[in-house]
Amino acid sequence: MYVHSVIGNIEAKTPTKTIEWIELDWDELNKRILRKTTDHGREVAIVMEEQGLTFGDILYEGEDVAIAVRTKLEPAFVIRPKTMKEMGKTAFELGNRHTPCLVENDEIYVRYDSTLAALFNEIGVNYEQTEKRFKQPFKYKGHHHHHD
């Protein structure tokens, strides 16, 4: 099957039919050309004209089935700072390490990294290891540190 556009999103329009999922790594959401297999074994070639993909995008809808995109469940940390000081220290340390993060409500989400637990303990911030489907790609902003 070949698809080249998004026809809707599950969060806005829940299909009443069977949903076949295409699972992507979070960094594949920005890719325009992909070849994937749904969780029901259907081959799908994705060639997007412009935009990338978003969690829940519907790529195909037939009489009895819809094909939608979701990200893979992956290990992550959810960090819950209790004060602005904890938030500031956590944000500083994550930024200093160039660790991409997502902030939703009062929580910070980062992909699992075995070195981060020690950092969170040192800061004294509340955190837990969990699994999460990241709904959007992390944004990397490359730059160089100059020490003259």
From Swiss-Prot:
Keywords on record: Chaperone, Cytoplasm, Nickel, Nickel insertion
Annotated compartments: Cytoplasm
SMART domains in the record: UreE_N (SM00988)
Gene3D superfamilies, sorted: Urease metallochaperone UreE, N-terminal domain, UreE, C-terminal domain
Ranges in a coiled coil: none
Molecular function in Gene Ontology: nickel cation binding; unfolded protein binding
Major location (coarse): cytoplasm
Protein's UniProt keywords contain Aminoacyl-tRNA synthetase: no
Entries under InterPro entries matching the protein: UreE (IPR012406), UreE_C_dom (IPR007864), UreE_N (IPR004029), UreE_N_sf (IPR036118)
Record function comment: Involved in urease metallocenter assembly. Binds nickel. Probably functions as a nickel donor during metallocenter assembly.
Family named by the database record: Belongs to the UreE family.
Name by which UniProt lists this protein: Urease accessory protein UreE
